[in-house]
From Swiss-Prot:
Residues annotated as transmembrane: none
Pfam families in the cross-refs: ACPS (PF01648)
Record organism: Pectobacterium carotovorum subsp. carotovorum (strain PC1)
Lineage: Bacteria, Pseudomonadati, Pseudomonadota, Gammaproteobacteria, Enterobacterales
InterPro entries membership: 4-PPantetheinyl_Trfase_dom, 4-PPantetheinyl_Trfase_dom_sf, ACPS, Ppantetheine-prot_Trfase_dom
Protein name in UniProt: Holo-[acyl-carrier-protein] synthase
An example Gene Ontology CC term for this record: cytoplasm
Taxonomy, superkingdom: Bacteria
GO biological process, one term: fatty acid biosynthetic process
C-alpha cells in the first residue's frame, strides 16, 4: 500500500449555521447523499452533522488532488459508520471513476468537532 493522497479540512460550525439560516436546506441538499439526508433530518444536532460531513468531503476532494470541481460534487462522497462507529467513505459517479483511475483501494477517515469547529482528514491508499 502507498499513500496516494492526503486531505484535511476545518469548518467553522457557525458559518454552516449562518448559511442554513440564509438559504434554508439548500446547502444540506447539495452536500448530502440521500442516505446522509435521512440521518441529517433525524439528528439531534443537524448543523454539527452537516459541518462534519462537509469537512470530510472537502478533505476527500483534496486527497484526490482536485478539490470540488470539474464534475466532482459533494454528494458523490458518502460518509457512513461501520459496525464499530468508525467513519468510512463511499464514492459515486465522478468520484468513483477518479478513485478507480487513481487505484484507490483503502480510505482512512478521521473527523472531530469541538464547540466552534469540525475538522476531518482523509487518506487514500493504493
Amino acid at each position: 500500500m502507498a499513500i496516494l493522497g492526503l486531505g484535511t479540512d476545518i469548518v467553522e460550525i457557525a458559518r454552516i449555521e449562518a448559511v442554513i439560516e440564509r438559504s434554508g436546506e439548500r446547502l444540506a441538499r447539495r452536500v448530502l447523499t440521500d442516505a446522509e439526508w435521512a440521518h441529517y433530518q433525524q439528528h439531534q444536532q443537524p448543523v454539527r452533522f452537516l459541518a462534519k460531513r462537509f469537512a470530510v468531503k472537502e478533505a476527500a476532494a483534496k486527497a484526490f488532488g482536485t478539490g470540488i470541481r470539474n464534475g466532482l460534487a459533494f454528494n458523490q462522497f458518502e460518509v457512513f459508520n461501520d459496525e464499530l462507529g468508525k467513519p468510512c467513505l463511499r464514492f459515486f459517479a465522478k468520484a468513483a471513476e477518479l478513485a478507480e483511475q487513481m487505484g484507490v483501494r483503502h480510505v482512512h477517515v478521521t473527523l472531530a468537532d469541538e464547540r466552534r469547529y469540525a475538522c476531518a482528514t482523509v487518506i487514500v491508499e493504493s
